[in-house]
Amino acid sequence: MSSTGATTVDARSLLWTPSDSVKDVNRRKVIRAAMADPGITQVSLAKRLLLSQGTVSAVVSELQQEGIFRVQSEEGERGKRVRLGAVRGVAVGVEVNHDRIAVAARRVDTSAVEYESMSFRADQGSSSWVRESANLIKELTVQTGLDIDHIVSIGVGIPAAVDPRTAMVTQVAASLDWDITGSVPERFRDHFRDVPIIVDNEANYAAYGEYLYGAGRGAGTVLFVKASVGLGAGLIIGGLIYRGRHGYGGEIGHLTMDPDGIPCRCGNRGCLETLVGGARLLEQVRQAYAGYRADLPTSVEGMIERAKRGDAVCRRVLQDAARTIGLALARVCNLMNPELIVLGGELGRAPELLLEPMMDGLRLYALRGMVDSKDPVKIVGSDLGLAAGARGALGFALMTDRTVEA
């Protein structure tokens, strides 16, 4: 029983129903969307789910009568806000990076997110990240009082292209020497049996996190650029992640900027990542300070901190990189014409230094109508910071009415 006396419903019984009737599918969609975005309005539910207002209203009314939904009208707003009633369940999102694993978790009936991250060495191999991720999930749920036995879904973002049809990894990030074969969800079965595991590229999930909870909220087309050790992107069109046929959508780091340029680990030459990847930026700082300073930054994060404190070399290297990224973004804009570009990853932690030179690069080659109109494409910093991927994984897994297995 809940504190109000109503019978508490297990969220899994609402989501894991076998019926594929139109009515039951729509019911699950509405429940999932309300869990993913607590307090969403009925108007937004219809828009996000591509359902009619009448269909959403009927489903919400039925769920309200059952005590599963609470519906409130707030002054000055269009549409009633929908929140869960006495429903018990936990949603989890995981992001695996080159140097860090992050986990976000929360109850499905609240927007309060618990978050934890840990250092992780990618050279530990492709087998350790599943174990470390599972351990971090368990630690976070214990520390915060969340019931691990009531997890309804786990979204997992990894630095790899993932085939959206099978959840199989098609290619790991060029900077990682990982051999990931087989089904990624299956790797989690020893730790979380019977829990749906929804796997995708970590930049895709970061894009979805900003779209659902952050800087991209309310935008129709959002391009998220993750600039850290490597460079990736995620594209949201009409609330959906664009992945492409084989999961390679968003590989902005491998746009060819110079056909005769530096060899890239992907096998090509002159990729954007060879010009603005973390290793290249650190090398430029080392070259600039050769013979002058020994206490050089060892990470992009360290470069950013020095630039913020006034280090002219770090600032110049970072701003030159931002301008180059802007040049590449002009190509993407000319093809996709996004409404909003969000800068995330490590470089997203210094918007005050990098957004302007990035926009300068974009303006050079983007079509005039996109940058000079009354409603130009905008570049903004991330609202969610380094938590974007884990939070997006959490939200997307809740929204997904399926488990993809190999």
Predicted regions and their residues:
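Glycine-rich phosphate-binding loop and adjoining helix at the ATP-binding site
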Residues: E116-T221, L353-L364
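ATP-binding/phosphotransfer module of carbohydrate and carboxylate kinases, centering on a glycine-rich
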Residues: M1-G76, R83-H150, D260, N268, ...
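Glycine-rich phosphate-binding loop of actin/hexokinase-like ATP-binding domains
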Residues: A219-V276
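Acidic-glycine-rich active-site phosphate/pyrophosphate-binding loop
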Residues: V184-E186, R243, G250-M257, L362-D372
